[in-house]
Amino acid sequence: MSAYRWFALFACLAMSGCASFGEDFVSMFSTQGERELDVGVRAYEDGEYAYSARLLQGSLDAGLRGTSNRVRAHKYLAFIYCTSNRVPQCRDEFRKALEVNPSFTLLEDESGHPIWGPVYRSLKPRKK
């Protein structure tokens, strides 16, 4: 076996022994804001809305990089505000997301949501 094959075999064995290697490797190059965004989205998915909102806002305050990351943070903040009946804050977060990326659209199942769907649609002009 060539040295490259041995190296590939060793690398596969080493990585199979630690499932979180990929996450650990990526987190080495992530900013604080990106890590807070990821944890904030997971907290949202777990129903921890107050904690999620703190993390999402913290990610933005930390200078979150990347258009898609900033839009994602604003979108989840909007969801949290809408579900807690804070419609003006919800609208403001959707507005901020659209300022970051005017092409921002919700997924089909998100835009049809009975609480935040109408708020989002009130800000997003319809295509003719």
Feature annotation, model-predicted:
Residues 66-70, 99-114, 119:
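Boundary/linker segments of alpha-helical solenoid repeat arrays
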Residues 14-35, 39:
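Bacterial Sec signal peptide processing site at the extreme N-terminus
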Residues 58-61, 98-99:
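Amphipathic alpha-helical segments of tetratricopeptide repeats
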